[in-house]
């Protein structure tokens, strides 16, 4: 029988938290409160296709764009055209605020209209098109991955589409 080798452990760099602190990083002082800022919906009244990051990174003291320490929210405007979106993120969520169109991503085409939600896994661009004015609210976790210094290696789930028509049935 071989005797185990004992190593002297050091806790100089360790931090200990009870559940209340771990569950509330703001209260424990690990992160600051996300500052309040209103973003005007006038962006959607303008012409052309564009993306507006709802960027608070300067106020948060982190690299941006970032709306919070771990997420970036964006407005996406489509004006009878096409807009490509891309993020180094584990997932992306698109909520359709108005209009109708379609998104090509992950080798599939997703027709959408107001009230629908599309969730995409890591791994590529999304191309949104609309023959009318349309608006999307886009959220992804690129700020968290940037902070951690990592990139997603593979998609961990299949794309998911939630029609607003289905929500009326439940």
Positions of predicted regions on the chain:
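A short, N-terminal "cap"/entry segment at the start of jelly-roll beta-barrel domains
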Residues: 1-68, 149-170
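Residues at beta-strand starts and edge strands
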Residues: 69-72, 132
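A short beta-strand-loop-beta hairpin characteristic of the jelly-roll/cupin
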Residues: 79, 83-116
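Short hydrophobic beta-strand segments that form the core of ligand-binding sensory/regulatory domains
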Residues: 92, 135-138
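Conserved metal-binding segment of the jelly-roll/cupin
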Residues: 111-132, 139-142
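Charged mid-protein connector segments
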Residues: 119, 125, 141-161
